[in-house]
Each structure stands twice: as structure tokens, then as C-alpha cells.
């Protein structure tokens, strides 16, 4: 696990807040820049060549190119006397002064509680308030929509700005702050919106920091009986952390400037490459990780557990902000999925590979679907081991792990904590640790040198893939047993404190829990970077080694498990403070380092050679900051360590014991895990005034792709009564509306000419609403506004084709009348991805009053009937499955040309691997069509329709004796056969 990440399935991307890598790449969500815009930019650059000062160019989602003027940082603008001040600066300084006055005049008994509430308020304004604004801006460009709807940046002389006073105030405010290269009238709306957003952020961040410092002053004190040495250590350590925090902030701002500091890429992008060094080579997300070291330094100087707990809460909230707001936007903007290769695959030359572990399955040749050739070309499965979402009781590895964990827990809890039991639990933990490092290390060493593990399975006729699966189970069981035994031993040695306030008891528990959390995060980061292949040492088993990429946590550390990967072990030492646990921790750390040096490192050097880097980002940063004398000392220490390790390797090679490796075969099944999402509850809003609107002027009509004939004729099958086995005779009625699963649906609507511009149409299940006048359930995003720029989000405009086209319509009473009409298309996430009967509802003025309801229509997936296919059963059935499956898969992939295949051989787009909703749609459709339930990972592993069709054929053959449908194959033996 110490190796760098595989290049398959993982890409290096920029870090979080204030540290995203501002590349000149195009954002993936809103399209690129028009050619005309690029020509405009070329002309601008040509005009500016004579300018000695290098300028930065910004690019809005609409393609507008503009010059980004230089700005100053927040602290300089507010506190520097040389910087011009305006009303917003005075307002921020006044709010900060109010906080200071509160500390001065509040009674001492109320200060702590009052400033705790004040700080939590500003922290909530930061993480929840700013987080919500950025989330809405990222997904629907809400802030820019607000600005455009209110016309606050439009010159009042045009007559379109109803707020001339606000316009003049904003113009004076912003031009005072940016005196160079900036014009309020000429700047795009996105940039002006960002500048206003900056002022709000300045207020929140300054008040957040000020209230925290004042809260620390209110909580500060000196513990009773504290000696001078402890006092000095506490203050020296605290000041060091604060100074380190200050350096992190300054260095981060030096690198990313104001653009990333204030989340500029939520509004526009800049065409500029930034060099990330300094703090960005030391730790992932430094503004969120090491950038909060000052909190703990101040808590240490204040000697207050109240302040420490508040600091931990604030730090956790910041990580939540990163995960929920920053990372999704960064992934969407900078880490676009690579374009799909549309080169046709020569299926005639595909060779079977038993040891194929790639996620890109081979395309299967039509002529090779017979006999044993089918088994050799089976696409690899994607039923991973790690993670709660991959836990499967049908798999022997998972069920064994669960049963053993239950047994260990019962033994640890039910047995007394006597010295005898403590000894055996500690001994058991030590033995498992020895096996995990020495035993597993020996197996991997032999596998690296002579393929011992693989040869054993090949000897018995198994494939390399089977050896790989059995190894994964063995390693997973060994790892879980090692940590379970250590936890059990720690539990036995732990004694519950009688007085949490005595000495450093509470602090030890807090630090211990923090170290445990650090190890969990490190393990998750390692797995995220390496995947299953790297986590289980896949390059020991497969010669087709992937290209090295240092991404994720490996961008900063070469071997994160060397220190951070064992932080939880030392956390247990702090919590228990017993010699036995200290011994286990020392043993674990020593064996882990030996495993890395004696097993992993030689194999990595043999496999990757010179492509291995010597120093990680953190080491490079530290070396640059060391004086020359210490650099030479570091080199000498490295030489001594290398010589010592080489001596140990030679000694072990000469005296290595012969270990017998007996491994039993495990049974593995695949089952699906579906995640259920809770329903969202909303309160219906009623429009009080509906006078002047005639509901006869409103109408909705539908157009869609009709479902297949099997789906339409299922209602008239022989399972019905005799009179119901034929299609119903419709007398003067329209045909039944039955649309394909996932196919786009076009909605045509009419409304009065004076209808509200905030009208909208939503998609619902018929059974969800009992009232035809009011909708009392949320559309859950399945709605589109009838007019553009009427709502505060762009997502509600996706699918809108036309609006307010005047047509002459005959009403139900026969009277002709001019009405407004429009069209929209519901597709993708705006559809229901299940079967049922649905309807569209036209709502009035942004509320839930229903003005028109469409005809009910049904979404139905027809059952595939292969009994009607004769001749070459396998070949014809598989071809028929491919033909039936291709349009369904295309619908499941939103008919997006970047991910939806055009032929059965074409590979899926890479976005299918990133977003699990696509594969879940496909497995639902397959289940309804063929009665076969797959896991979503199967769809991603197969990679194209042909492989998926083969898997369905194979599953139908395997499950044929248990099928509930008619079949021409073998059935249960009759009495005649038995006799």
C-alpha cells in the first residue's frame, strides 16, 4: 500500500479552498468559449503586448473575455492606513469594535457563554451561509441570476435599473477598492457579483476570527498547581502553532492570490497557470488541515477545554464545508472526465486473458461464443471488498470476518480483565501483528520472486484471477484480525477514569481519539488513491503494471502508512497509558517499517526502477528550508539507514525459515446493494389571487418514444381472464400513452397571454397527489420553468425549448382564442427512473396551484421473451439481447453522446465510472427486462453493451433450472425419468 497510485481510475486534481489549481482548462458544466470569444481574446492580447505589466484574463461561462484587475488582500484593505477606506470597511471595523466592547463591558460570568454563542453564529455564517451560497452558485449560478434579475449592475440611465442609489453606492465602493484596470460599467456581471460577494465574505471571516480570539481571552486562565516549566512549554508550543498557522495562511495566499481565496472559480475562470509550492506540497488541503493548527495553539495557551472543544467543532465544520461544497465544485470544474475513445475495436483479434484486472473489459468476438471460449473471455467482476457499501454476507470472506469480529467482541466484553486474560489478549494481538507483517510479507516476497501464490493455484487448474481473489480474501481477513485483536487487547488493558478532570486525563483521551481519526482518514486516503488493486498489492500478481502517478496523499508522502498509518496505535497508547499497549505499538511500528523496507521497497524498485521518485512533496519542502549543514547530515543518515537495511536483508535472505502456506478455497457470490434515499418533505405554498386566469386556456400535451410492443401487449397476456386476453377496443379515444424507460418526453403547453412568468411544470406520480387543484408533494428537481430568467437557478431552465409563442387555439367550448405556448423536454435527472403511471402538472406563479394536468402516461419496460427465437439458440438470443439492450442503455445514459454508446461494441464514457446513477439505472432495467439482478459494479466492469449481453446470456443459462418462465431447456426430471 505504500506505492504510488495506479494511473487507472484516478487523476491528480487541485486541492480545496484557497488552493485549487487554476488551470486554463474549460469548465465542464457550462460549456467552453465560443470561437468569437477566442478571437476577441486574441485581439485583446495583441493590443496589450506593449504593456509592460502582465495582465490576467478572466473568462465567464458565457465566453466573455475580460481583464482581471489586481486586488489587495482582506487584512491590508481593512487595517492598513495607506489603503483607501469606504463604507463597507467602516461597517466591518465597527462590527469588530462592537465585539471588543462586549468583551470589555460584559460581566465576567456571561463572557464565556456569550462569546461561545457569538463565535458559533459567525462560524455557522461561514460554513452554512457561505456554503449554501456557493453551492447554489456552483449548481445554478444563483448569485449571478439574482444580480441579473435585479439589474443592480445596469446603468440607471438605461431605465432598466430600479435601484439607482444602490448602483451608485456599489460603483463608488468597488472602484474605490480597485483603482487600477477596473471599470464598474464595463466589467461583466459575474465579476461584479464576485466583488460584492467578497465584501460579505470579508465581514464573516473577520468577525469569525475576532470572535474566536475574544472567546479565547474570555476562557483563558492558568491551571491550579501548574509549574513554571509546564507553563513555559504550553506557551512555547502554542505560540509555535500560531506562528506556523500564520505562515500557512500567508504562504497559501502568496500562491493562490485573491481569486482562489475568495472562491473566484465559482463565478469565472482565469487563463493563468499557478505554480503550487510551499505549503501546498506539505499537506492535502492545507487551509483546512494544517491551516487550523493555530486553533489548537490558542487553546493550549488558554488552557481551556471549552475552547478546545469549540475548536474541534469548528474544524470539523470546516471539513464538512470542504466535502459538501468545495470538492464537488472542484471535481466538476477542473477534473473533467477524459473524452471517450470512439475507435472501433477489432473484435476478431481479442485474446483471452485470465489475469486481466483492468476495468476496461475486452470486447467479445461473435465467433467465440461457444464452449469453453466463453468462460475464458468472461469480463472481470467489480465486487470490491473494502468499505461498508461492499459488505456482502453471501461472500465467505465477509461472513467470516463478521462472525470472527462478533466472537472477538464477545470474548473481550464477557471475560474479566484479570492479568491472565490480559496476557492472553496482548499475546494474541502480538501474534496477529507478527503474522500480518512477517507471514504476509513472506508470501508477498515469494510472490515477487517466483510467483509462489499464483503457481499454487495454477497447479490445480485455477486461473491467475482465482489466485488474486483468494489472496484478497486472505489479506483482508488477516488485516481485520490484526486490528480486531489489537482493539480487544486495548479494551482489556483500559480502565475507565474515575476523575476526568485529574491531570491530563481528558487531554490524553482527546489526543488519542484525534490520532485514531487521523489513521482512519489516512487509510481512506490511501484506498482512494490506490483502489482495490493497489491496496491488495496487485502489482505483485500482475505483470501489466500501471503507470505511476503520485496523486492524493501520495502527492505529499511516499509511505503514509509509515507514520500516519499507525497514528491510531499511538492514540490507543495515549488513552490506555499501559506498558503492554506501548509494547504492542512499538512492535507494530517496527514490523510495519520492516515490511515496507524488506518487502514493498525491493519489489517497487524491481518493477518501476528509475520512475520511482526519491522525495515526496513534504520532504522536498522541508529540505528547501534546511540549512546546508543539516542537509548534509540528512544525507549521511540516509546512507546509514540504507546500509543497515541492506545488511538486514542479506541476513534474512541467508536465514529465512521455510513457511508452509496452506490456503483453502473460498466461495464468492455477487449480490446487489441498493441505497435508499429518504423522501424530501416540503410545505405547499398557495397563491391567494387567481382571479383573471381561466383554466380553460391552460393545457399540456405530450410527445415521447412509445414503449416496445412486448410492454404494450403484456396487459393482454394469458394470465388474464378470457375476455381480457386481447387488446382493448378503443372507441374514439386516443391511444394509450406508454413511453420508453428513460426516453426524453417533450411537453407542449398553452397558457393565457398574461400568465405569470414564474409558471412551472412538474413531473409526478399519479398516486402522489390526491388533489387536482393543489400539488402537495415536492417535485424533487423534476420541474422546468416556462420562461427563462424567472427563477434563481439555471437548472430549472435545462430542457426549455421555447416560451410565449402566440398561437390561435380552439378552447374546449369551441371558442378560438390567442394564447401563449411553449415547449420543453424532460430528460435525465428530470425523469423518474422507475416504472409507473405519471402526469405533468402546470403550476401558477412559482407556487403549487395547479392550472392544468396532462393525460396520465405509463413508463414501462417490456419483458424480453427469448422463447420465440428458434435456430441457433445461443447466437440468436445473444444478438436479440444486444439489440433490445442498446436503446435501453442509451436512455439510461441520458442519450449523452459523450457517454452513451452508439453500437454494442462501443465503450461507455468515463463518466459512467464516476457517477453511480447510470449503472444503477441499467441494472434496474436489466432486472425488469430479463429477471436477472446485477450489482451496479457489473455494468461498469463490462464497459459495453456486448459484454453486458454476454453476461445476461450466461446468467440465464446458469439460472435456467430456476426460471419461472417457459423454456425449451431441461426441466425437473419426471417420474418416468426417475424409474
UniProtKB/Swiss-Prot annotation:
Residues 1-63, 335-362, 704-729 are annotated as: Disordered. It catalyses: a 1,2-diacyl-sn-glycero-3-phosphoethanolamine + S-adenosyl-L-methionine = a 1,2-diacyl-sn-glycero-3-phospho-N-methylethanolamine + S-adenosyl-L-homocysteine + H(+). GO terms for cellular component: endoplasmic reticulum membrane. It is found in: Endoplasmic reticulum membrane. Keywords: Endoplasmic reticulum, Lipid biosynthesis, Lipid metabolism, Membrane, Methyltransferase, Phospholipid biosynthesis, Phospholipid metabolism, S-adenosyl-L-methionine, Transferase, Transmembrane, Transmembrane helix. It comes from the Eukaryota. Pathway: Phospholipid metabolism; phosphatidylcholine biosynthesis. The keyword Heme does not apply. Residues 12-21, 37-56, 343-354, 715-729 have a biased composition (Basic and acidic residues). It holds the Pfam family PEMT. It is a multi-pass membrane protein. Its EC number is 2.1.1.17. Residues 111-113, 221-227, 303-304, 419-422, 495-499, 587-979 are cytoplasmic. Residues 1-89, 135-199, 249-281, 326-398, 446-474, 521-565 are lumenal. GO terms for molecular function: phosphatidylethanolamine N-methyltransferase activity. Its main location: endoplasmic reticulum. PROSITE patterns: SAM_CHO2. One of its GO terms (biological process) is methylation. The chain crosses the membrane at residues 90-110, 114-134, 200-220, 228-248, 282-302, 305-325, 399-418, 423-445, 475-494, 500-520, 566-586. Catalyzes the first step of the methylation pathway of phosphatidylcholine biosynthesis, the SAM-dependent methylation of phosphatidylethanolamine (PE) to phosphatidylmonomethylethanolamine (PMME). PANTHER family: PHOSPHATIDYLETHANOLAMINE N-METHYLTRANSFERASE. Belongs to the class VI-like SAM-binding methyltransferase superfamily. CHO2 family. This is Phosphatidylethanolamine N-methyltransferase. It comes from Paracoccidioides lutzii (strain ATCC MYA-826 / Pb01) (Paracoccidioides brasiliensis). The lineage of its organism: Eukaryota, Fungi, Dikarya, Ascomycota, Pezizomycotina. The gene is CHO2.
